[in-house]
């Protein structure tokens, strides 16, 4: 199952991003995408 989350504040994104296992970061159009 895939879930997409959009966060407006860096603090929100950081809390969720740190909990993602096996995370990869991709930059598309200046935006960071975490998979």
Swiss-Prot record:
Entry EC number(s): 3.2.2.9
UniProt keyword annotations, A-Z: Amino-acid biosynthesis, Hydrolase, Methionine biosynthesis
Catalytic residues (positions): 12
Pathway given in the UniProt record: Amino-acid biosynthesis; L-methionine biosynthesis via salvage pathway; S-methyl-5-thio-alpha-D-ribose 1-phosphate from S-methyl-5'-thioadenosine (hydrolase route): step 1/2
Biological process, per Gene Ontology: L-methionine salvage from methylthioadenosine
Disulfide bonds, paired cysteine numbers: none
Record bears the keyword Amino-acid biosynthesis: yes
Catalysis performed (reactions): S-adenosyl-L-homocysteine + H2O = S-(5-deoxy-D-ribos-5-yl)-L-homocysteine + adenine; S-methyl-5'-thioadenosine + H2O = 5-(methylsulfanyl)-D-ribose + adenine; 5'-deoxyadenosine + H2O = 5-deoxy-D-ribose + adenine
GO MF annotation: an example: adenosylhomocysteine nucleosidase activity
Enzyme class: hydrolase
Quaternary structure annotation from Swiss-Prot or TrEMBL: Homodimer.
Functional note: Catalyzes the irreversible cleavage of the glycosidic bond in both 5'-methylthioadenosine (MTA) and S-adenosylhomocysteine (SAH/AdoHcy) to adenine and the corresponding thioribose, 5'-methylthioribose and S-ribosylhomocysteine, respectively. Also cleaves 5'-deoxyadenosine, a toxic by-product of radical S-adenosylmethionine (SAM) enzymes, into 5-deoxyribose and adenine. Thus, is required for in vivo function of the radical SAM enzymes biotin synthase and lipoic acid synthase, that are inhibited by 5'-deoxyadenosine accumulation.
Similarity-based family: Belongs to the PNP/UDP phosphorylase family. MtnN subfamily.
Name of the protein described by the UniProt record: 5'-methylthioadenosine/S-adenosylhomocysteine nucleosidase
Gene field: mtnN
């Amino acid at each position: 199952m895939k879930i997409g989350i959009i966060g407006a504040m860096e603090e929100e994104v950081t809390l969720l991003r740190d909990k993602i296992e096996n995370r990869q970061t991709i930059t598309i159009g200046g935006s960071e995408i975490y998979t």
